[in-house]
Design a protein with these regions (language model features):
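Rossmann-like NAD(H)/NADP(H) cofactor-binding core
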Residues: 51, 81-84
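Short cysteine clusters
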Residues: 58-61
Length: 133
């Protein structure tokens, strides 16, 4: 027995399941980029990049890591990246990073915004929303 309405519902359900699976795959592929003196300029020179300046020994920095990763999945129009200040002192000195965590937004290679401290999800949300396309 062929019911066209039932077939239509099945096709819609299948399309929804495929779309959901593709979204899940896309979400899992989004990651925070580790920056160093070799890749910093090439990564920050194109589009929007929010950079987290952090250190291994910094408790507030470590608290921000999962928040930063969640926000990277939410705001896909922005690249999210990290600079370990102990391993990349030249980069942190270049941008005058004196407190950590410090978050700097770059647009096409130019610094356009900055926040300091463990700002949590509201802080990252605020800066990301400000540069939403």
């Amino acid at each position: 027995m062929d019911d066209p309405e039932l077939e239509k519902i099945k096709q819609k359900k299948l399309a929804d399941m495929i779309a959901q699976q593709q979204e899940s795959i896309a979400q899992s592929q989004i990651q925070v980029i580790d920056l160093n003196s070799m890749n910093f300029d090439s990564i920050t020179s194109q589009g929007l990049v929010l950079v987290d300046f952090w250190a291994e020994w910094c408790g507030p920095c470590k608290l921000m890591h999962p928040v930063f990763e969640r926000m990277a999945k939410k705001y896909r129009h922005i690249k999210f990246a990290r600079v370990n200040v102990d391993q990349n002192q030249d980069i942190s000195m270049k941008f005058g990073v004196q407190a950590i965590p410090t978050f700097i937004m770059f647009k096409d290679g130019k610094q356009v915004d900055r926040m300091m401290g463990a700002v949590g999800e509201p802080g990252i949300h605020m800066i990301a929303k400000k540069y939403q396309m």
